[in-house]
Every structure is written in C-alpha cells, then in structure tokens.
Amino acid sequence: ITVEDHAIIGYDATILCHEFLQDEYRTGEVVIGERAMIGAGAVILPGVEIGAGAQVAANSLVARDVPADATVAGVPAEPVDRR
C-alpha cells in the first residue's frame, strides 16, 4: 500500500492488498495519490489506484481505478458530478 503526501483516509476505511474469493486469491498494490481523500467506511479493493486529488465518498466500494481529481460514490463506486 502506497499513501502519497497529504492524502486523507477516513475512519474505518478498509484498504485491501489481497482478497480471498471462492475460487481465487487476488492480490494487487494499492496507491492512494497525493491529496486524495478516502471517506469513512470506504473499501478499496486490491490493485486499485486512487489518483491525485480524487475523492471517494463514505461507505463506497472501489473496485476500479479512480482518475485524478474525480469523485466516486456508491457500491460499486461510480463517478459523480461535482457541480
């Protein structure tokens, strides 16, 4: 797990580098970019990269990479408009 400068990880967030599934065992490096924000209770799955300045809403499940400066929310996490 790599957490870059000034990233914020909320209370009770879970960052996984490995995952046991019924028929497979997944592993992967997780990178939390500079100034990224992970909300409370969010779950980041193995192999995901959260880009610099990205935001993950509380209680979201992140299964795919999040681009820099994007905001994602939900289960599974999807991009949301930050108007």
Question: Which residues does each PLM region occupy?
Answer:
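Acidic, glycine-centered active-site loop in nucleotide-sugar glycosyltransferases
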Residues: 67-68, 73-76
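Flexible, glycine/small-residue-enriched loop-and-beta-strand segment within the central core
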Residues: 1-50, 75-76, 80-83
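Binuclear metal-ion centers of metallo-dependent hydrolases, dominated by the metallo-beta-lactamase
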Residues: 56
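Catalytic-loop signature of eukaryotic-like protein kinases
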Residues: 53
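Active-site-flanking alpha-helical
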Residues: 12, 59-60
